[in-house]
């Protein structure tokens, strides 16, 4: 899902097709309220809830394997950037709210959009074959690239992929609509050669084409209402931010042996029901 999110973010950032210092500063200001502020508030909320839980449950830690009361000033800062560097933590290089690594990387990419625009604007004036070959070559080469906390090569490439359509003022749905099966077969081929980012590119084409066809069919049938309940649409970001708390509760219940699967069927049911529980509780709290 994350490559698609970066793709859409790039398309929206450059939706005007133009770029200027004033527009750049305006977009950064808007994203300070839509990305940075929620980012800080949610991570601070998680820190508060974890400190309360650690006070209630002695010798208990979650997400970070170090008691919050033992945090140094650096540890507190790392919670907002990369918890893998807190003590012997290791693991994924993400902030305390682990899914927020996407927001962190997106904010960093937004800072570099003047450079991204210059490169893509140059490519937009070249033959389209050059842009296509360069993009696929970079996606293939990215399998050997080292990601830095806050700067994802995958994120940068798919953000640029979406941005390219906006800068060139081409509707990507018009380009991708007839490529449904081509995108799927390409994704399968990329999966077979173990190149995840090329696979994601194919899946984006397949998903956009399929979704466009479904919506067009609904429009022809005069079913213009969006097929998802409004409550799910309105709570999307809250579910994205909150579901890790519910997941932590489920994992704690399993680790403490409160719920123990006795066979493979029960384990499978727990696996299937967990995301349903996370969604239901998150939407309910919202």
Predicted regions and their residues:
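Alpha-helical transmembrane segments and terminal signal-anchor/GPI-anchor hydrophobic tails
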Residues: 151-160, 167-273
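Hydrophobic alpha-helical segments with transmembrane-like composition
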Residues: 5, 14, 35, 46-58, ...
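Alpha-helical transmembrane segments of multipass membrane proteins
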Residues: 42, 46, 50, 109, ...
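Alpha-helical transmembrane segments and their immediate interhelical/interface regions
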Residues: 1-28, 187-196
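Membrane-interfacial loop-to-transmembrane alpha-helix junctions, especially the N-terminal start
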Residues: 23-31, 125-132, 173-182
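Transmembrane alpha-helical segments and their boundary/interface "anchor" motifs
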Residues: 2-4, 18-79, 90-91, 181-182, ...
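Specific transmembrane alpha-helix
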Residues: 2-15, 104-118, 138-174, 198-220, ...
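Membrane-helix interfacial "entry" motifs
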Residues: 19-27, 31, 90-94, 98, ...
